[in-house]
Structure formats: structure tokens, C-alpha cells
Regions:
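Basic, flexible Lys/Arg- and Gly-enriched helix-loop patches that mediate nucleic-acid binding at interfaces
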Residues: 1-235
Length: 235
């Protein structure tokens, strides 16, 4: 079995992310650091990531976490900022986030040890819907709503059509519900910036079939069986 596939089956990361980890020199097989793709893993081999032995997980676990602003979704942070995974050090299995929420954003984050599901959900072909509640500076006009819906030019590439609905007009801000299926870096923030509106607060309220609901900020819960079925059936 290829090393990156083995890592995915251990729940470490998607194959694509596993390849990045290998290239960064974070993976060893039987004590030998691996940096090239194509390495085969045989039964009895000891694979370590960041010095920690990994093994395929037999029981898949799925957790919804309401990430607050001010936490990073990486496994560790060189700047010493608080990491999402700090909350799960004592969890029975090692969890990994499915995708990311940027440092200043909050909301629904899925964590799991199911590497195969992670890979499927993050693959561009599945176009997983991600819905955000954005509070932005100023008054968003209908012309700007139409621009956001049709696509905004970012890095010389137009964003895919988005679902956009104004929820509330405040004295100096607008609350907007936005659904996208792409995963560009800080995409929603940059889309609004291109229309002249700074994002004041951004919360992800839906991810695929999952709904954040009333889960308090900074709290987590395991998915219900119905929620797990909705994920595994579709993805």
C-alpha cells in the first residue's frame, strides 16, 4: 500500500495533505525519514508522523466543533497560537479537521479519523456546500449581491456562482448569508472586500448536510447516527 494511502486510512489526513506532510519531511517508515512519493508500506512497518506512531483506526469517529475566532485549525502552530486540536488531546482517537476555518473566523468544523471521507469531502469534484453568516461593514446593495452571486474575480480567476441573501440591514453593517462550494483561501472575506465591504464577523453555519444549530461557541459534540449516514451516503 502506498504511504499516503496508509496515512489516509489511519485518519491522519487526506491523501493530498499526506503527500504535503511527506514532502515536508514529517513522516518516517521504520525510522527512516521519507520525502518522496511512491514509498510502499508493508504489514509490520512502523509509520510515524511528527514522531508519533500511527495505525489504521478500526472505529471511525465524527465530531462537530463550534470553533471560536482566535484558534488555528492546523495540528500545531509555530507562532504558539491556540489550536483547535488542543481541545481533543484526551479524546480516545486522534482526530483531524476536515478542511479549515481561518484564524479570525468561527463556526462549524468537522473533525474525524476517517481519512477516506475527508479525502472525498475535500475533493473539488464533490463541490461540498459551505454556508456562512457574514456581518460586513456598510450597506450591501442589490447590485453587489448580483456581483457576488455571479462570481468575483480573485487572483485572475472568477469565483463560482454563490448563493447570497441579505438577512438584516443594520445602521452601519449588513448581515448576509453566503453559500459557496469552492475552498479558496479566505474566499468569502475577499469576495466582500472586492465589493468594498470589510467582513466584521464570519461564522460557518453549514457544512455539507451538517448544521451548526445551537451548539455553543467553543463546544463540541459527536455526530448523530443520522448525520453520519448523511455524510457517508453522499460522500
Amino acid at each position: 500500500m502506498r504511504l499516503q494511502k496508509y496515512m489516509a486510512e489511519c485518519g491522519v489526513a487526506s491523501r493530498r495533505k499526506a503527500e504535503e506532510m511527506i514532502a515536508q519531511g514529517r513522516v518516517t517508515v521504520n525510522g527512516v525519514r521519507i520525502t518522496e512519493m511512491g514509498t510502499q508500506v508493508e504489514e509490520g512497518d512502523e509509520v510515524c508522523v511528527d514522531g508519533q506512531l500511527i495505525r489504521p483506526e478500526t472505529e471511525k469517529r465524527y465530531v462537530m466543533y463550534h470553533k471560536p475566532a482566535g484558534e488555528v485549525t492546523t495540528v500545531s502552530d509555530p507562532e504558539g497560537r491556540k489550536c483547535v486540536l488542543d481541545h481533543f488531546r484526551d479524546y480516545p482517537v486522534r482526530l483531524y479537521p476536515v478542511g479549515r476555518l481561518d484564524y479570525d473566523s468561527e463556526g462549524l468544523l468537522l473533525l474525524t479519523n476517517d481519512g477516506a471521507l475527508t479525502e472525498r469531502m475535500l475533493h473539488p469534484s464533490h463541490q461540498v456546500d459551505k454556508t456562512y453568516l457574514a456581518r460586513v461593514e456598510g450597506s450591501v446593495s442589490m447590485d453587489e449581491v448580483r456581483q457576488l452571486r455571479s462570481g468575483i474575480l480573485l487572483d485572475d480567476h472568477k469565483t463560482a456562482p454563490a448563493k447570497v441573501r441579505v438577512i438584516k440591514l443594520e445602521a452601519y453593517a449588513t448581515v448576509v448569508l453566503v453559500t459557496i462550494h469552492e475552498g479558496r483561501n479566505r474566499q468569502v472575506r475577499r469576495m466582500f472586500e472586492e465589493t468594498g465591504h470589510r467582513v466584521l464577523q464570519l461564522r460557518r453555519v453549514q457544512f455539507g448536510p451538517l448544521d451548526l444549530g445551537e451548539l455553543p461557541r467553543g463546544k463540541w459534540r459527536e455526530l448523530t447516527q443520522e448525520e453520519v449516514r448523511s455524510l457517508t451516503a453522499y460522500y
